[in-house]
Amino acid sequence: MLLEVAKLKVCYDKAMILNDLSIGVEREELVSLVGPNGAGKSTLLRAITGLVAWEREITRRSTGGDVTIEGTVTFEGERMDLIPAHEIVKRGLIHCPERRRPFREMTVIDNLYAGAYLLIEKKKVQDNLEKVYQLFPVLQKRSNQVSGTLSGGEQQMLALGRALMSRPKLMCIDEPSTGLAPILRKHVFEKIVEIRNLGITLLLVEQEVSTVFKIASRNYVLSSGKIIAEGTGEQLLQDEVLRKTYLGL
């Protein structure tokens, strides 16, 4: 198992966001996390990549509030819950946040170089850049354009490309289709499949259930911070109550 999350609990003050949650992801899998808004999907990604622990320190310093984390996150046999977020990145576990969030005042190519800040050898950086350009030709065409002027679809390509620049082993991608037109959503999902085909493991949070079930090897359904179902898209769609109550289908 490449990634194992065991009995994870996250509380913001007294609000329980994740409750005794456990999941696993095998190497080179594409696994999705689906469920209603507020189920805890994005919090799970942030906990895996060390951002909840970082938020805990910021919250304590700024407001005196508390964020409680329990449970374990293990990646390639090493405990990620015991090391800070920047060390988690060095292990090859990358978070690609929702709403894309490029450095808006920087050019496309400078955004991409920012994603490669851990790589010391210039040749590796250039090799990665060429691979990103092969996957996303539009980024090469827009390389000197300020990223804040890109379309929503182009910004999503940039977010994925920036994450790929660090040579990740596992990418946690949070709602990549949010706010995109249907034709752009289709294009983004095609690119996500291409990334998986490169041998990169993917853990994907997505609201577009009908599409993600077609491309994911397995899916976890979350509700109120708990896993309530797991299986292939075909298996989950056979459950009428699950389909109507939790998946909105």
Task: Give residue ranges: language-model regions.
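Glycine-rich phosphate-binding loops of nucleotide-dependent enzymes
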Residues: 2-249
